[in-house]
């Protein structure tokens, strides 16, 4: 028998916000109106829209309950991971993704946690792709893979659903693949 041990396993957390449909109906028109009225000459993504850095989005009154939900989930994830102190939300923003939009590989160092909440995600949404840090060293080299699994895959994609919150360590490099749907 060969024993194995997971070294430095990483937990990625998912929680579902129950009043997601109600929040979606309320805030999607507000966010689309903000995009329409934005006079900035430089857009963050072609064919999409990202409002980043102007404010902490979750401080708006319309997001009060969602912010409380996210704060609670992140604190529970933090404790479950065995970390000390209490994390606090530093920034939040929104992106509107349309056909052909994407977001390249990046992370949000030096914080502790990153998270993505999906206000609206249809079944064709590409989800959140987390990049395996072990692959940066070209492991497993030239041997190939008999099957892809959590150990040898270069990335894992977390499905996106309306109302889902995905929380992961900030050091994890992540991306959003090209959007293929028309929405």
Name the predicted role of every residue range:
Residues 97-167:
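Catalytic core of non-heme Fe(II) oxygenases with the double-stranded beta-helix
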Residues 1-81, 102:
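Non-heme Fe(II)/2-oxoglutarate
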Residues 55-57, 80, 95, 122-125:
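Contiguous segments within soluble domain cores/interaction surfaces
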Residues 83-92:
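A short coil-to-beta-strand element that immediately follows conserved catalytic motifs
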Residues 173-180:
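Conserved small/polar residues in nucleotide/adenosyl-binding loops
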Residues 7, 86, 107-111, 181:
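A generic structural micro-feature
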């Amino acid at each position: 028998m060969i024993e194995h041990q997971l070294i430095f396993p990483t937990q990625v957390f998912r929680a579902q916000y129950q009043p997601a449909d109600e929040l979606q109906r309320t805030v999607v028109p507000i966010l689309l109106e903000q995009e329409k009225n934005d006079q900035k000459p430089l857009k963050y993504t072609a064919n999409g829209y990202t409002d980043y850095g102007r404010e902490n989005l979750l401080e708006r009154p319309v997001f009060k309950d969602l912010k409380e939900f996210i704060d609670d989930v992140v604190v529970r994830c933090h404790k479950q991971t065995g970390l000390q102190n209490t994390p606090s939300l530093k920034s939040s923003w929104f992106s509107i993704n349309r056909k052909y939009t994407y977001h390249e590989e990046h992370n949000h160092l030096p914080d502790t946690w990153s998270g993505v909440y999906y206000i609206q995600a249809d079944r064709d949404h590409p989800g959140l792709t987390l990049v395996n840090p072990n692959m940066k060293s070209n492991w497993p080299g030239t041997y190939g893979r008999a099957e892809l699994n959590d150990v040898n895959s270069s990335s894992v994609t977390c499905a996106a659903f309306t109302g889902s919150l995905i929380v992961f360590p900030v050091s994890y490099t992540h991306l959003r693949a090209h959007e293929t749907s028309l929405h």
